[in-house]
Amino acid sequence: RLHTYKYPGIYNVQITSTGNFPQIGFYKNNDYDGPYIIDTQVYYQASVTKIFNPIPVCYDTSGNKVTSFDYTFYYCKSLEAIPENLFSNYNDITSFKYTFAYCTSITSISENIFANQSNVTSFDHTFSGCYSLQEIPENIFKYNTQVTSFLAVISSCSGLTVIPENLFKYNTEVTNFASVFNGCSQITSIPEKIFSYCPNVTSFAGAFAAMKKLITVPANLFVNNTKVTGIGSLFS
């Protein structure tokens, strides 16, 4: 059911369910063009500013507990704060594609936000376009040891000035770092050992493209990445 508010403003909405948590979507009044309700895209483009509690257990249309938070907060431009226990009700998520992409008001992220997620394989575009983000915690991916793709995970995060050297230390299964730092225009240097623990990488395509202030690239940056086959547009 679609409910349209007559006047713009702030509304307190309470949602209850006698069974599975319902699939819902929030839309701006003039943007609605039909149901865009897919799994956990609960807050898609919503004007949410803060989240205080963990996401409750959600189920898909087949009654199975969700295993993906793809696009959940995509384009929530007003979202300012994310609790570190946001996903604490889950321990079997496999994908966080575009989860916080273009959440342009987020300035920080807890290093423990993905601590329970040991089965994740994809962080593609998770924080893409979060240009107000000031830093990325060094241990944010520490417990996500099954990840195979960090495609554009923090691309276009133009507020970042530093890349932690051990950011991917525990992600030894990664094969894809394409566009990983693409558009991080304030970063001036790359840590020499940032990819040292990732021997299975095959693609760095566009990894450092559009990094306008990049000055220093270590000579041994890729010394342990002997399986790489894709480096197109690496710095362009």
Language-model features: where?
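Negatively charged
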Residues: 1-236
